[in-house]
From Swiss-Prot:
This is Serine protease inhibitor Kazal-type 1. It comes from Sus scrofa. The keyword Disulfide bond applies. CDD domains: KAZAL_PSTI. Disulfide bonds join 9-38, 16-35, 24-56. GO terms for molecular function: serine-type endopeptidase inhibitor activity. Transmembrane segments: none annotated.
């Protein structure tokens, strides 16, 4: 298993790309791509890390 890492935010002004490249967050939720996870983290106080690439 790879170590947990933070989601890398791209400066997508128009939102996240509609590319399905799932990542599994440390909250046990599968996000459709790293950008989506990053966007969700901006709304949280405690960021969710990427547990692994691929669905949970």
């Amino acid at each position: 298993t790879s170590p947990q890492r933070e989601a890398t935010c791209t400066s997508e002004v128009s939102g996240c790309p509609k590319i399905y490249n799932p990542v599994c967050g440390t909250d046990g939720i599968t996000y459709s791509n790293e950008c989506v996870l990053c966007s969700e983290n901006k709304k949280r106080q405690t960021p969710v890390l990427i547990q692994k690439s691929g669905p949970c």
